[in-house]
Swiss-Prot record:
This protein binds to the 23S rRNA, and is important in its secondary structure. It is located near the subunit interface in the base of the L7/L12 stalk, and near the tRNA binding site of the peptidyltransferase center. Part of the 50S ribosomal subunit. This is Large ribosomal subunit protein uL6. The keyword Repeat does not apply. HAMAP family: Ribosomal_uL6_B. GO terms for molecular function: rRNA binding; structural constituent of ribosome. Keywords: Ribonucleoprotein, Ribosomal protein, RNA-binding, rRNA-binding. It comes from Desulforapulum autotrophicum (strain ATCC 43914 / DSM 3382 / VKM B-1955 / HRM2) (Desulfobacterium autotrophicum). GO terms for cellular component: cytosolic large ribosomal subunit.
Length: 180
């Protein structure tokens, strides 16, 4: 049995969890999320807890699915109750970001500004022109959007210029040694 999968997930007060067939729906104050379940995974809702179990606990792949779906359900519950946020820093001379409706306009050293269309359910906020904050209820979409924006201009190892996560540390390389 999966150690993570065995732990039940606590359901907060303002969150509703329902299972219909192979679809789980979670509604909360921030919104609602749906996900289809694998045929080998079973969910049981008892006493304000969600228990994840599998049909065959001897097969390694289904045991791995138990831990996976337990984590996915926990992330969905956290998303609809609290939400997720990722911060990106723009480091470089003249690097800045601005939000126009559903588009983030990035000036990151290219000859033209880069227009990045935000996916549905993601909101962006710019603080001090160099900090971009992405928020939403789906952890996967927030993380994927942050990774796609970072990929536009990843930080380079010599000066650290580029787009980086707020908690990321760039290991800088030494430059060329001067000629003697």
């Amino acid at each position: 049995m999966s150690r993570i999968g065995k732990k039940p997930v606590q359901i907060p007060e303002k969150v509703e969890v329902s299972v219909k067939g192979d679809l789980i729906s979670i509604k909360g104050p921030k919104g609602s999320l749906d996900r289809s379940l694998h045929p080998a995974v079973k969910l049981a809702i008892e006493n304000g807890m969600v228990n994840v179990s599998v049909t065959d606990d001897q097969d390694r792949k289904t045991v791995a699915l138990q831990g996976l779906f337990r984590s996915l359900v926990a992330n969905m519950i956290t998303g609809v109750s609290v939400g997720y946020e990722k911060k990106l820093l723009l480091n470089g001379i003249g690097y800045r970001a601005e939000v126009n409706g559903n588009t983030v306009v990035l000036n990151v050293g290219y000859s033209n500004p880069v227009n990045f269309e935000l996916p549905k359910g993601i909101s962006a906020l710019v603080e001090k022109n160099t900090t971009l904050s992405l928020s939403g209820i789906d952890k996967e979409i927030v993380g994927e959007t942050a990774a796609r924006i970072r990929r536009i201009r990843p930080p380079e190892p010599y000066k650290g210029k580029g787009i980086m996560y707020s908690d990321e540390r760039i290991i800088k390389k030494a430059g060329k040694a001067a000629a003697k």
